[in-house]
């Protein structure tokens, strides 16, 4: 066992003495040492219950003859960080989480680990660490929040964000906004739609690193606690088997995950996180792979924000395994999973408990919601290295759009103009200097996109940015434009009133300005330098382009 490096032989008597000081017995010294990597925090609804989930994991480890050791990681709530300087720290926290896990796992020489996680950048950080340290690893995601219920219908946090714009335009009252605020988020769990947190939970299951059914088992469901305990039991077996993370996850596993992502209409943040995770597994996942697979992967379920179903509907319809069963002819079925069985064997064992709900919520490949997957990668003279859009959440009439640029050098500038009502039908809002280096930190633009939606402009106004979006964003919103403005990308050359052409079916994003005029602008170009101190200052120096997953170089 790896942990014998800390506890076996006469030379390790001092090490054992310290372990005995924390209560480890002689008999336990002979057992596998299992880390329980817990991102529990009191800041985040998606994490508030993870202390209890971790206790269930530890019980499972003990049941199977292992010794659990729990430690914690940091976690930023994107929803609470939204719309202000705090959001600059969200994406950079991904690498900080990964680093701290590596330090603890390698420093203490753990035999295996169960990672208890939830929410947007935290789960990717855990997955990246799993690839880097390459020991037996299982991920237990915390599960979705139940939806709220307002005006006789289910709702979620995005309704509150969009309510801000609706209130500003006079469409709803301050009293109604307060009602939404009070009732849309009703307890523990990650936000109730197919936003980034739940998308990444689905990716984890599709990659084979969670037990089947884990992604959609809700935070308040006893099923989650049972799965946590089963994960604790299974990790001890995996240590005995020598089944490490890199023996499970391959290029083909990532293809499976991307197909699930495309079929469920997942968050565009997967185009950052999956390449970054692949990098830590020693693999390369080019952005173009999303386009390649999108052409042959239909969109099968209308989940918020790209539909009216919530995660509870998806869970009752069978969750990720139900989607994989629909996609069975397109998946790599021989890939291993943490169950010890293959993807195909797991699908064969999956039973549809609610056939009517399954048929209502999840379409067939023959009659999908959309022939193509949820995400498209656009390129052109405005995004030579690529940009991304959740096309499944765009109204058909806005798949192609041409309009004048309204240019802003920060989210705050754009938000002020939007809320004043100065954005008109047909406009293309440009928010730049929000990229990985330019922000720095690549903030999410959920506040401006939700304001546009709340003001009734979602089907007539586009927004493009070198920043990124929440998984809750809907509409013609194109992000991750690369190269970013800070690095001299064409988005930095746009002037007020320039015509921008968006063509999602053809995967094009064009600035309708002659190359001669653009060259004149390049000569005069000087990037905006936003102040950055501490961690963000270091991050700016080492982060790569969004087209490469914003990994560190």
From Swiss-Prot:
Q: Which organism is it from?
A: Methanococcoides burtonii (strain DSM 6242 / NBRC 107633 / OCM 468 / ACE-M)
Family per record: Belongs to the IlvD/Edd family.
- Give the record's cofactor note, including how many are bound: Binds 1 [2Fe-2S] cluster per subunit. This cluster acts as a Lewis acid cofactor.
Q: Record-annotated residues binding Mg(2+)?
A: 78, 120-121, 444
According to UniProt, this protein's pathway is: Amino-acid biosynthesis; L-isoleucine biosynthesis; L-isoleucine from 2-oxobutanoate: step 3/4; Amino-acid biosynthesis; L-valine biosynthesis; L-valine from pyruvate: step 3/4
> What is the official name of this protein in its record?
Dihydroxy-acid dehydratase
- Give the first-level EC class, as a single word: lyase
Could you tell me which PROSITE patterns the record lists for this protein?
ILVD_EDD_1, ILVD_EDD_2
Annotated GO biological process: isoleucine biosynthetic process; L-valine biosynthetic process
Q: Which InterPro entries match?
A: Dihydro-acid_dehy_C, DihydroxyA_deHydtase, DiOHA_6PGluconate_deHydtase_CS, ILV_EDD_C, ILV_EDD_N, IlvD/EDD_N
Q: How does it assemble?
A: Homodimer.
**Which keywords, in A-to-Z order, does the entry hold?**
2Fe-2S, Amino-acid biosynthesis, Branched-chain amino acid biosynthesis, Iron, Iron-sulfur, Lyase, Magnesium, Metal-binding
Catalytic residues as annotated in Swiss-Prot or TrEMBL: 470
Record: residues binding [2Fe-2S] cluster: 119, 191
């Amino acid at each position: 066992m790896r942990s014998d490096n800390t506890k076996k032989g006469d030379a390790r008597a001092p090490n054992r003495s310290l372990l005995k000081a924390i209560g480890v017995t002689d008999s336990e010294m002979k057992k596998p040492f299992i880390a329980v990597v817990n991102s529990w925090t009191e800041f985040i609804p998606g994490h508030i219950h993870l202390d209890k989930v971790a206790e269930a994991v530890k019980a499972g480890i003990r049941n199977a003859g292992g010794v659990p050791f729990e430690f914690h990681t940091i976690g930023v709530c994107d929803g609470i960080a939204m719309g202000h300087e705090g959001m600059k720290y969200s994406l950079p926290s991904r690498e900080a989480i990964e680093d701290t896990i590596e330090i603890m796992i390698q420093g203490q020489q753990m035999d295996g680990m169960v990672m208890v996680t939830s929410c947007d950048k935290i789960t990717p950080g855990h997955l990246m660490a799993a690839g880097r340290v390459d020991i037996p690893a299982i991920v237990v995601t915390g599960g979705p929040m139940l939806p709220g219920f307002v005006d006789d219908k289910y709702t979620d946090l995005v309704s509150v964000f969009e309510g801000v714009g609706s209130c500003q335009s006079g469409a709803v009252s301050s009293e109604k906004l307060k009602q939404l605020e009070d009732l849309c988020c009703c307890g523990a769990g990650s936000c109730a739609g197919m936003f980034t947190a739940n998308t990444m939970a689905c990716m984890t299951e599709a990659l084979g690193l969670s037990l089947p059914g884990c992604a959609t088992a809700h935070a308040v469901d006893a099923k989650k606690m049972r799965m946590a305990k089963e994960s604790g039991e299974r990790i001890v077996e995996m240590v005995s088997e020598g089944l490490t993370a890199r023996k499970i996850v391959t290029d083909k596993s990532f293809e499976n995950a991307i197909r699930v992502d495309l079929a469920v209409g997942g968050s565009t943040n997967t185009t950052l996180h999956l390449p970054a995770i692949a990098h830590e597994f020693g693999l390369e996942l080019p952005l173009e792979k999303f386009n390649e697979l999108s052409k042959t992967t239909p969109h099968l379920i209308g989940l918020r924000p790209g539909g009216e179903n919530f995660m509870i509907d998806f869970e009752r319809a069978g969750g990720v395994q139900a989607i994989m069963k629909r996609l069975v002819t397109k998946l790599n079925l021989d890939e291993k999973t943490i169950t010890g069985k293959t993807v195909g064997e797991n699908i064969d064992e999956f039973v549809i408990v609610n056939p009517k709900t399954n048929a209502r919520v999840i379409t067939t490949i023959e009659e999908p919601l959309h022939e193509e997957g949820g995400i498209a990668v656009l390129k052109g003279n405005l995004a030579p290295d690529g940009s991304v859009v959740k096309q499944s959440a765009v109204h058909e009439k806005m798949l192609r759009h041409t309009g004048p640029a309204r240019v802003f050098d920060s989210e705050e500038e754009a938000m002020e103009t939007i809320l004043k009502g100065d954005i008109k039908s047909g406009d293309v809002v440009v928010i730049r200097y929000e990229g990985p280096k330019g922000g720095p930190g690549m903030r999410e633009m959920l506040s401006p996109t939700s304001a546009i939606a709340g003001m009734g402009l979602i089907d007539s106004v586009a927004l493009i940015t070198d920043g990124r979006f929440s998984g809750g964003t809907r509409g013609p919103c194109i992000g991750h434009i690369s190269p970013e403005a800070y690095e001299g990308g064409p988005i930095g050359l746009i002037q007020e009133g320039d015509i921008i052409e968006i063509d999602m079916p053809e995967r094009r994003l064009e600035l309708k300005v002659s190359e001669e005029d653009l060259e004149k602008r390049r000569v005069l170009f000087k990037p905006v330098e936003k102040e950055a101190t501490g961690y963000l200052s270091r991050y700016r120096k080492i982060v790569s382009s969004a087209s490469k997953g914003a990994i560190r170089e």
